[in-house]
Amino acid sequence: MEVFILELVLGSKNITLEDLINVTRKGYKVSISEEAYEKIDKARALVDKYVEEGKVSYGITTGFGKFAEVSISKEQTGQLQKNIVMSHSCNVGNPLPIDIAKGIVLLRAVNLAKGYSGARRIVIEKLVELLNKDVTPWIPEKGSVGSSGDLSPLAHMSLVLIGLGKAYYKGELLEAKDALAKADIEPIPALSSKEGLALTNGTQALTSTGAHVLYDAINLSKHLDIAASLTMEGLHGIIDAYDPRIGEVRGHLGQINTAKNMRNILAGSKNVTKQGVERVQDSYVLRCIPQIHGASKDTLEYVKQKVELELNAVTDNPIIFVDTDEVISGGNFHGQPMALPFDFLGIALSEMANVSERRIEKMVNPAINNGLPAFLVEKGGLNSGFMIVQYSAASLVSENKVLAHPASVDSIPTSANQEDHVSMGSVAAKKSKDIFENVRKVIGMELITACQAIDLKEAKDKLSPATKVAYDEVRKIISYVSEDRPMYIDIHAAEDLIKTNKIVENVEKAIGKLEF
């Protein structure tokens, strides 16, 4: 039987968001093209030439940051590169998830494969070997200001290459030297000129973090449309608001796609209604689903464009231009081009939870829930039902509003004011991750609340084919709430169900791909 090895070849073409996820979550192998090797060798030769001739070049024959004016001798260049890795590894807090840490390794390898950094072959080969043998650097999540790039988290990554720090081997946390030994990887004996800087100067930590959030947010936006459709079923929502002509006269693609999703998901439902039958129009959280969800989708699409640029960007400093024999100091390490999009990502995610929570409130509030019992429970008063589910959702939405404050508008100068404007892009990326995790919980709450409303309406036999699929997936693991029970169990189960992506996968099997 022929075995096909799924592989990403660096240097042959630009990588995509999907490529990143294939390596970090699906175990795709990585290799280096001959074209990339040629570029790497040429850039390295120019670095060696600068060192031999004693030319002044930042980070090659000088110190770093405020020490840029301090000359470093040829004999000290290797120690200089080891020192930057050791002294800059200052991150704190919980470790980054393994997939995000793998992404950092991959993106640094992509960067070096461009041939503008001047590191030797062995450096990029060791990064690739880490990926292919499932050794992942242990990197605490806090400590980067996003300029000069992600110095501290990338230093933690780089420690592993020289046998220092900590690393995971097949998920087990070990001292780096032990993880390397188990994987049969030899550490780099010594870093050479420019290599410590080439490893640590860039935006790969913030980019990997934000890229993984973005990938999951795209799938979550589909869950949001499905949850909203279940709510429409439970509240007998008016379908007219999703008429394609409404989107066409405004023109926003996210709105158009969301309306299409809603029409397709609800096609065949005998619960939804038409305007003027039960009431003239719905409140905004139902009627404006295409406009609200769609605006977040448009934002995700914008962020995706920026992310896929940055996945392939040269973010080193200085940059080696072999065609003109120049080593030029610039600012490609500055995280501002990604800090702003990741702040925008957090805002878009926050709004997804905002509207979802309002639909939960609409279902549990007897004044506005179209005839459902208060808090969706029989024997109300004795039972509180879904009352506190809405409290929990409100708490998470409120937290998101705080987290949605942009990090990129802040700057605290570093390195004795040599680095006098920083991006805080790593903070923006981390915030988007924290917001995402809250949003996923809130959408899980809407799923279980909507299924409860459907049961109370005795409407499950009138569901559309697609909403019936989603309803059944929920009911496989979360039963109808006939009397009070610990609701956190159901909430966590709903979140875990979203993590599996089974609802989206099975709905798409039933009706075709949902639009993003």
Swiss-Prot record:
<dbReference type="InterPro" id="IPR001106">
    <property type="entry name" value="Aromatic_Lyase"/>
</dbReference>
<dbReference type="GO" id="GO:0004397">
    <property type="term" value="F:histidine ammonia-lyase activity"/>
</dbReference>
<dbReference type="GO" id="GO:0006548">
    <property type="term" value="P:L-histidine catabolic process"/>
</dbReference>
<dbReference type="InterPro" id="IPR022313">
    <property type="entry name" value="Phe/His_NH3-lyase_AS"/>
</dbReference>
<dbReference type="Pfam" id="PF00221">
    <property type="entry name" value="Lyase_aromatic"/>
</dbReference>
<feature type="modified residue" description="2,3-didehydroalanine (Ser)">
    <location>
        <position position="148"/>
    </location>
</feature>
<dbReference type="InterPro" id="IPR008948">
    <property type="entry name" value="L-Aspartase-like"/>
</dbReference>
<keyword id="KW-0369">Histidine metabolism</keyword>
<dbReference type="InterPro" id="IPR005921">
    <property type="entry name" value="HutH"/>
</dbReference>
<feature type="cross-link" description="5-imidazolinone (Ser-Gly)">
    <location>
        <begin position="147"/>
        <end position="149"/>
    </location>
</feature>
<dbReference type="InterPro" id="IPR024083">
    <property type="entry name" value="Fumarase/histidase_N"/>
</dbReference>
<comment type="pathway">
    <text>Amino-acid degradation; L-histidine degradation into L-glutamate; N-formimidoyl-L-glutamate from L-histidine: step 1/3.</text>
</comment>
<dbReference type="GO" id="GO:0019557">
    <property type="term" value="P:L-histidine catabolic process to glutamate and formate"/>
</dbReference>
<keyword id="KW-0456">Lyase</keyword>
<protein>
    <recommendedName>
        <fullName>Histidine ammonia-lyase 1</fullName>
        <ecNumber>4.3.1.3</ecNumber>
    </recommendedName>
</protein>
<keyword id="KW-0963">Cytoplasm</keyword>
<comment type="similarity">
    <text>Belongs to the PAL/histidase family.</text>
</comment>
<dbReference type="GO" id="GO:0005737">
    <property type="term" value="C:cytoplasm"/>
</dbReference>
<dbReference type="GO" id="GO:0019556">
    <property type="term" value="P:L-histidine catabolic process to glutamate and formamide"/>
</dbReference>
